């Protein structure tokens, strides 16, 4: 099995504050109406941290094995989340339209766990106002619009870096991305996610509420 954590783990300075989730939980006046939101957050999860934390918890479930038991990943797509300027919608259709298996399997190169894909559709995709296929096409388009800095594609040893330095690396690699459109989240001194704000047509845009909750 690839030495995923040992050689690929990405560390955040232990002095950093822990971060909360993007956006407040309070809903705005639109009350989870599908398609009624202000912008997207593309959330990119740092896979080595996820796998290391899962190992420490003794979590060897099917979803963990799908991401952590095969080829080593760096950043994987956690999701594309509709957001309000303050807060976010979720689970906008109950019951949610059934996600076709062929759509799920088509996304495994970006989101390497079936359970994650189904959950993202139920929780976030149903709020996009898009059909199943169009929503996951939007995820693929959003991911293609973001270039991962070269130095984080193939780490050979643990690395410690400040969140601002990581943000700067993404900004340099992605013309048009500003520090008001990106945030870095961490957990227990490890990199957790990079979150990038995008307009509904998937262009980089500022998001003060999301950035305010980043690691600093």
Predicted region positions:
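Sec/Tat signal peptide C-region and signal peptidase I cleavage site
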Residues: 22-26
